[in-house]
């Protein structure tokens, strides 16, 4: 777009539908271009081109289309894509979903402006995720180890304490090693004012805000803003990681609200719906977010992602968790059954998986016994869980002494390893030591997945 076109204001708005408006009689317009909008009463708003064909442009209005009409609304195409000003001064600040300060502080003086859509990384320029990220949560650090550069979602359900878990991870997460810089970028989408106040209070009272950048999009904010919030958060994370050499953990919650906004916008555009009404491009859209995690050759920093989503009706085959599972490297599943038992965090380790856990375990990363003792504990817990179903049918009297030991181990595992205080920050060494202590419940002959050397070194003597 040339300089002359940037000064032209169009009044040829032909239709307004939901958050979208259609402008006709234009030329030289590009997809993703930012639009300045002036309402009939002189208020300034911002939009983005969603579709450009021939002489027609479909524009999404970030602040909503209330008070706009087709006769008096003025539109100017800027020729620029959506950008955010980034700076290390963003650490310790809280912003709204569009990147405007929400904490009463001054505007950020940007070191540079960056396109919020990021830039595609050549796979050859990526390094495989490596090195341990400690969250202080035993069921993550121990059994589903998080690795720098990884993307691993948390699958939750309505009413489960995923917000509490997200805040705890944001407070406690750290990387090990001398002189390593660490930051958290936290983005909440479509949350209530009550949830927003909870997150802000948690970050402020614990001091976690000092190492964090927080973006909050409320449920009553425009759905369009929900689409750009995770992109702004990831752009900030990439800047801190690749230009400032920091290891950045990005927590995105709730991706279900993000996908609902995608569906709402697709419906307003009269697009042909895909599975359960979601747009057919939802897979590629989610991939454009998740694939921004990683390690880049020649760069010290890393971007690690924990997207959180609530599964509608606890259905793990729903399109949102289903497509997310194809793109990411595992999943952490919260269990309603464990939650009913009063267990926090209610992480069910059996369906949970970190496909890259091995990259963050072992000498120099965690401890030499990590992988083996977790394998042993996982197998024993799975057997104990299976025996509970048998007890429900035949009663505990029918069990052998061996079976009773595994049943006892499963109960103890949930009580000592899975169960953890909201403010309890466990090191990986503490987690592994607890597991070794619980393994004394089992006959030594059943410890087939750990070597005699490890048993001699770590198993407490009775």
UniProtKB/Swiss-Prot annotation:
Has multiple subunits with at least A(3), B(3), C, D, E, F, H, I and proteolipid K(x). CDD domains: ATP-synt_V_A-type_beta_C (cd18112), ATP-synt_V_A-type_beta_N (cd18118), V_A-ATPase_B (cd01135). The lineage of its organism: Archaea, Methanobacteriati, Methanobacteriota, Methanomada group, Methanococci. This is A-type ATP synthase subunit B. The gene is atpB. It holds the Pfam family ATP-synt_ab_N. Transmembrane segments: none annotated. It comes from Methanococcus vannielii (strain ATCC 35089 / DSM 1224 / JCM 13029 / OCM 148 / SB). The keyword RNA-binding does not apply. PANTHER family: V-TYPE PROTON ATPASE SUBUNIT B.
């Amino acid at each position: 777009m040339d300089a002359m076109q940037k000064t032209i204001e169009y009044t040829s708005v032909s239709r307004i539908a939901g958050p979208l408006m259609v402008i006709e009689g234009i030329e030289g317009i590009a997809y993703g271009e930012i639009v300045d909008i002036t309402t009939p009463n002189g208020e300034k708003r911002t939009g983005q081109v969603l579709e450009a064909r021939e002489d027609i442009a479909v524009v999404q209005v970030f602040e909503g289309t209330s008070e706009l009409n087709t006769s008096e609304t003025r539109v100017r195409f800027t020729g620029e894509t959506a950008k955010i000003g980034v700076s290390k001064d963003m650490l310790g600040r809280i912003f709204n979903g569009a990147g405007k300060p929400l904490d009463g502080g001054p505007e950020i003086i940007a070191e540079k402006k960056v396109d919020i859509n990021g830039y595609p990384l050549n796979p050859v320029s990526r390094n495989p995720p490596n090195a341990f990220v400690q969250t202080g949560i035993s069921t993550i650090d121990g059994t589903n180890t998080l690795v720098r550069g990884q993307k691993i979602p948390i699958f939750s359900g309505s009413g489960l304490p995923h917000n509490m878990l997200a805040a705890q991870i944001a407070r406690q997460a750290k990387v090990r090693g001398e002189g390593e810089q660490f930051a958290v970028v936290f983005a909440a989408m479509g949350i209530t004012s009550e949830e927003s106040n909870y997150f802000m209070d948690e970050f402020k009272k614990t001091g976690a805000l000092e190492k964090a950048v927080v973006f909050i999009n409320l449920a009553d904010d425009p759905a369009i803003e929900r689409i750009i919030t995770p992109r702004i958060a990831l752009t900030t994370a990439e800047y801190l990681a690749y230009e400032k050499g920091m290891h950045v953990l990005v927590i995105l919650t709730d991706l279900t609200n993000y996908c609902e906004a995608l569906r709402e916008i697709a419906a307003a555009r009269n697009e042909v719906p895909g599975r359960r009404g979601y747009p057919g491009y939802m897979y590629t859209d989610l991939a454009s977010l998740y694939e921004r995690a990683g390690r880049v050759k020649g760069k010290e920093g890393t971007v690690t992602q924990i997207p959180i989503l609530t599964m509608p009706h606890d259905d793990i085959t729903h399109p949102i968790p289903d497509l997310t599972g194809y793109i990411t490297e595992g999943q952490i599943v919260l269990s309603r059954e464990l939650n009913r038992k009063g267990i926090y965090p209610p992480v069910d380790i059996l369906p949970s998986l970190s496909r890259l856990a091995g990259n963050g375990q072992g000498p120099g990363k965690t401890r030499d016994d990590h992988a083996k003792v977790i394998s042993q504990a996982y197998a024993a817990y799975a057997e104990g869980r299976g025996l509970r179903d048998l007890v429900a049918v035949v009663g505990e009297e029918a069990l052998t002494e061996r079976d009773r030991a595994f049943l006892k181990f499963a109960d103890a595992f949930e009580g000592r390893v899975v169960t953890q205080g909201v403010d309890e920050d466990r090191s990986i060494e503490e987690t592994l030591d607890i597991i070794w202590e619980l393994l004394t419940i089992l006959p030594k002959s059943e410890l087939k997945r750990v070597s005699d050397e490890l048993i001699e070194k770590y198993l407490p003597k009775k």
